[in-house]
């Protein structure tokens, strides 16, 4: 089992939690981004830089992910693709994507995109807050406790 991270928009606090988990549990964490990422020296942490381009990081994650992996992303289409390959998908705010909720989330994303393209200001996500980090940490810890042998 590996952890794949959609790192371009991933909050720093989430990356730091993942670095600590990688070291503590000796689980491979791979961060994928279209920019250079500085990561701590560790045989369990690697950064992959992909060429700049629409969905290049997402496409690389889909290539790498296998059944049973954990993907960290807020990108709904990427989450859908990872779920199709049998991965677990957690967003940086601590919410799980699942086969049961992905279609609803894709539909809502499409509706919001249509509203924005027609000129309606839909706002954006709320700023990342401490409670988001706590929710993510709790979900990550529970997942790793069930899926990684110490």
UniProtKB/Swiss-Prot annotation:
InterPro entries cross-referenced by the UniProt entry: UPF0178
Signal peptide start and end residues: none
Family label: Belongs to the UPF0178 family.
Protein name (record): UPF0178 protein Reut_B5138
């Amino acid at each position: 089992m590996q952890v794949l991270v959609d790192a371009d928009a991933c909050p720093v606090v989430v990356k730091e939690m993942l670095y600590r988990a990688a070291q503590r549990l000796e689980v491979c964490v791979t961060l994928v981004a279209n920019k250079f990422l500085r990561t701590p020296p560790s045989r369990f942490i690697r950064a992959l830089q992909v060429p700049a381009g629409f969905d290049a990081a997402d496409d690389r994650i889909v290539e790498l992910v296998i059944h049973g992996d954990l993907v960290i992303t807020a990108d709904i289409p990427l989450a859908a693709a990872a779920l199709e390959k049998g991965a677990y998908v957690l967003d940086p705010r601590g919410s799980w994507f699942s086969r049961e909720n992905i279609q609803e989330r894709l539909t809502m994303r499409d509706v919001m995109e249509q509203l924005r393209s027609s000129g309606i200001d839909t706002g954006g996500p709320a700023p990342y807050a401490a409670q988001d980090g706590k929710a993510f940490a709790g979900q990550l810890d529970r997942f790793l406790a069930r899926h990684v042998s110490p």
